[in-house]
Amino acid sequence: MAVFVANESGVTDFDEVTLAALARFVLDTMKVNPLAELSVMLVEIDAMTDLHVRYMAEEGPTDVLAFPQDEAFEPSWSESPEEDPTTLLGDVVLCPEVARRQAAQAGHGMERELHILCTHGILHLLGYDHAEPEEEREMWKLQNSLLASWDTAAGTGAS
């Protein structure tokens, strides 16, 4: 599972290696093809604002955006990964400045918020959405379950 993290935000008070490990954990847990590739980009607030306006037609910055490589992609786990071509899942774009504000409001650290947002973005790449109430309940339940499993596996608590 290849996870590439590119920090273009200028924010450095989080662990990029841990963020990549979380992304791998989520993809493994969701049984995504082990040859899959994911990019996680962290950008400045101005860049996130531009992306949000351009791709979502919404003003202002947002916390996370997910750009699937292939809209028709169906994530799969293969018993013979060597038979599957490498799957480019897409990009998860995070904004640490927005994450920091949200973390303060939620009462936890920015790194925890980045973990929440990264997990959320990956779920969007895997086809989950929250446009309808039932979808939202399903996605949030799965997101919380994945994060709780990560906390246990990584030996961290929600912080």
From Swiss-Prot:
GO terms for biological process: rRNA processing. The keyword Nucleotide-binding does not apply. It comes from the Bacteria. Binds 1 zinc ion. Keywords: Cytoplasm, Endonuclease, Hydrolase, Metal-binding, Nuclease, Ribosome biogenesis, rRNA processing, Zinc. One of its GO terms (molecular function) is zinc ion binding. This is Endoribonuclease YbeY.
